[in-house]
């Protein structure tokens, strides 16, 4: 297979990934592959572009490094072109409502007829099968959080609250990435393709599993947090200092001992309620939990963030200032690791945003291209799989493909 023009880099160089999906979840998987060196083809509808394009800045991050193909993959010669593309594809990711592709005739079996080694990742809100009441429903971030039991655990004691920005989409996209790579590893051993069914609500069910285990195995459900503090453990969560907010985790034997000395509770150490060797203070079960919070609140309120960070570093207590977005760029850790970077858009502008993660030492990722325009690479991709100029123009004339104007 001849690859499309692009630099060779990263741990996934030589891999061809194709995705069909809009907005965030499915495309986030494609973004990860593209930043790690894979050749990633982004399929868009011919009649209307991905709705993410209406956003002024985010698409320049989420669609960088991609090749843009505008093709009607469900109709006539457009479908034939799509299946031809699948013959040279390693991983295909689609994000839709339930078994939407199967309903329109593109089943796993059809895809495997054209490429027996193909890894297929289906990403939907409620999965490829189940009850009709749910399977075909649309789903976005908040829907997946609400249905999974994740949302009800977040917020404050007075009201649940979804986690933003778009947590379920990103977790689901990352799940698609890792699952597809796991499947590809097996395919290269057996020569037999794989189909993966990723339900967003099940992804979030796993993300919310920590507190749920107490309910499933004991009938007790952890209460929601109060003012950003951990619902279980004192000294953990969000706290206010004299000049702003920090988060901290009071965990560890020596950490508790030294902190208690600072906040005036040394006399509680080695008591029946806080015996020697205590590593966590349970805010509900320990009768001194509320007192610990009261004393800690008072001590933190009397000190600046800088003073708290310095003292907690001496005590090996994990803590961090709650940074504002403007503070990120100048933070020395961000600067040292180049966590924020710049790249050129296709129209020559400079765009700034998060850099590639994680950092591969021997085969690093890179940003080699900004977001392509609608249909920008259609002709190049179709030529790559054997279509002539006349073939491409015929697809365009029938409204089955769009090329860049």
From Swiss-Prot:
Coiled-coil features, chain-numbered ranges? none
Pathway annotation:
Amine and polyamine metabolism; carnitine metabolism
Q: Which GO terms describe its cellular component?
A: cytoplasm
Q: Does the keyword tRNA-binding apply?
A: no
Q: Where does CoA bind?
A: 97, 104
Gene Ontology molecular function, alphabetical: L-carnitine CoA-transferase activity
State the InterPro entries in the record.
Answer: CoA-transferase_III (IPR050509), CoA-Trfase_CaiB (IPR023452), CoA-Trfase_fam_III (IPR003673), CoA-Trfase_III_dom3_sf (IPR044855), CoA-Trfase_III_dom_1_sf (IPR023606)
Q: Where in the cell is it found?
A: Cytoplasm
Give the top-level enzyme category: transferase
Where's the active site on this chain? 169 (nucleophile)
One of its GO biological process terms is: carnitine metabolic process
In short, the EC number is 2.8.3.21
* Gene3D superfamilies for this protein: Crotonobetainyl-coa:carnitine coa-transferase, domain 1, formyl-coa transferase, domain 3
Which keywords does UniProt give here?
A: Cytoplasm, Transferase
Known catalytic reactions:
crotonobetainyl-CoA + (R)-carnitine = crotonobetaine + (R)-carnitinyl-CoA; 4-(trimethylamino)butanoyl-CoA + (R)-carnitine = (R)-carnitinyl-CoA + 4-(trimethylamino)butanoate
Principal location class: cytoplasm
Protein family: Belongs to the CoA-transferase III family. CaiB subfamily.
Biological role:
Catalyzes the reversible transfer of the CoA moiety from gamma-butyrobetainyl-CoA to L-carnitine to generate L-carnitinyl-CoA and gamma-butyrobetaine. Is also able to catalyze the reversible transfer of the CoA moiety from gamma-butyrobetainyl-CoA or L-carnitinyl-CoA to crotonobetaine to generate crotonobetainyl-CoA.
Self-association and partners: Homodimer.
Per its record, how is this protein called by name?
Answer: L-carnitine CoA-transferase
Q: Whose protein is this, by species?
A: Escherichia coli (strain SE11)
Q: What is the lineage of its organism?
A: Bacteria, Pseudomonadati, Pseudomonadota, Gammaproteobacteria, Enterobacterales
What gene name is given for the protein in this entry? caiB
